[in-house]
């Protein structure tokens, strides 16, 4: 009897809720929209770099070509390249002005409803976004699997996964430091809590 219970527990770990075809199509549509937006972003970046390169070529190409030797020609070309480079790249100022121009950090709030949503959360970590994950809409077994997947991905990507609530976790990339003092997490109606070790209770 104990052996049968153990097999049932192992099998239930890999079971997921039945996914309807509508949900499958919905997931496929979301992934195609995400791919399109990523492709558009990459295309914009390549256009910007192409515009910068073409501006430099126009500066160089607009000068008349002379066949006479000019000893200062190479020096002038170097100065022009340096000036073009300095105009294209932002200047680094002292620490006070850098603090004022601090880069904004966004935190995405996700409520995964099925295991497949874990990939979307990991994709956000890949692009260095912080994610606050609340597993309140998932079953216990699915939430454990999802958390296991996210924890593994965060370790591969050198991110950090920290528990901040009874069913909430904060996923941060490597360049974000989170200072959480010990918190006493109140149990607000939810009796189960998820833990990193994924042990069955």
UniProtKB/Swiss-Prot annotation:
Homodimer. Interacts with FtsZ. Keywords: Cell cycle, Cell division, Cytoplasm, Septation. Its main location: cytoplasm. InterPro entries: Cell_div_SepF, Cell_div_SepF/SepF-rel, SepF-like_sf. This is Cell division protein SepF. It comes from the Bacteria. Pfam families: SepF (PF04472). Residues 27-38, 72-81 have a biased composition (Basic and acidic residues). The gene is sepF. Gene3D superfamilies: SepF-like protein. Residues 43-54, 83-92 have a biased composition (Polar residues). The lineage of its organism: Bacteria, Bacillati, Bacillota, Bacilli, Lactobacillales.
């Amino acid at each position: 009897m104990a052996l049968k219970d153990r097999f049932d527990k192992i099998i239930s770990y890999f079971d997921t809720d039945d996914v309807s075809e509508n949900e499958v199509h919905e997931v496929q549509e979301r992934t195609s929209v995400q791919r399109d937006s990523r492709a558009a972003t990459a295309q914009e970046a390549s256009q910007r770099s192409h515009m910068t390169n073409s501006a430099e070529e126009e500066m160089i190409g607009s000068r008349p070509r002379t066949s006479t030797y000019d000893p200062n020609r190479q020096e002038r070309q170097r100065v022009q390249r340096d000036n073009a480079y300095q105009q294209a790249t932002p200047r680094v100022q002292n620490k006070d002005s850098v603090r004022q121009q601090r880069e904004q950090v966004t935190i995405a709030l996700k409520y995964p409803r099925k295991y497949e949503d874990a990939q979307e959360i990991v994709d956000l970590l890949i692009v260095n976004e912080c994610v606050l994950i609340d597993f309140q809409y998932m079953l216990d077994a699915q939430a454990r699997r999802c958390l296991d997947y996210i924890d593994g991905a965060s370790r591969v990507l050198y991110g950090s996964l920290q528990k901040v609530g009874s069913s909430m976790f904060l996923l941060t990339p490597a360049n974000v430091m989170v200072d959480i003092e010990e918190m006493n997490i109140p149990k607000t109606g939810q009796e189960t809590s998820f833990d990193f070790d994924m042990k069955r209770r």
